[in-house]
């Protein structure tokens, strides 16, 4: 049985698009974008090597403030890219279908989350190590302290 750790990053004063593109450039772990509570999955970068910044902009422009279903978002991916590009997203969806963490509250402060899929998580120190890894990853993004868009990190474990 798998466990899922969802890291939520709180922003301060940056555009959602800029923050999302920063995710795509900076991390090699599973990614999840939330807008109006809608989970939006990206897999690790290899299957998405051909996804361009323009494509991401198109995807983001298609995500309106109106509530869309997860299938609506997947259809957007299909429309904008070759089906093979999103295959790993569909595989992830299959794995999460019965174990997705459910509704995630989205506020003005919460613009995204990173979904980390691991084996069973039983020891607190393993969770702490993963949180430290995420903090290190953010440090590598080389934001000046005053310009860093993230002001808090917390995690839900399911």
Language-model regions, residue ranges each:
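Acidic (Asp/Glu-rich) sequence patches and key acidic residues
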Residues: 1-149, 154-158
């Amino acid at each position: 049985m798998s466990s899922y750790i969802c890291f939520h990053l709180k922003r301060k004063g940056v555009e959602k698009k800029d923050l999302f593109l920063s995710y795509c450039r900076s991390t090699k772990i599973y990614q999840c974008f939330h807008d109006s509570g809608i989970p939006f999955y990206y897999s690790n970068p290899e299957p998405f090597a051909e996804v361009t910044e323009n494509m991401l902009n198109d995807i983001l422009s298609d995500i309106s403030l109106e509530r869309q279903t997860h299938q609506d978002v997947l259809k957007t991916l299909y429309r904008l890219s070759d089906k093979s590009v999103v295959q790993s997203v569909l595989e992830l969806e299959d794995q999460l279908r019965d174990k997705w963490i459910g509704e995630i509250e989205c506020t003005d402060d919460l613009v995204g989350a990173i979904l980390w899929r691991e084996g069973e998580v039983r020891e607190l120190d393993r969770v702490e190590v993963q949180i430290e890894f995420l903090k290190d990853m953010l440090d590598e993004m080389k934001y000046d302290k005053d310009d860093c868009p993230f002001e808090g990190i917390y995690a839900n474990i399911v």
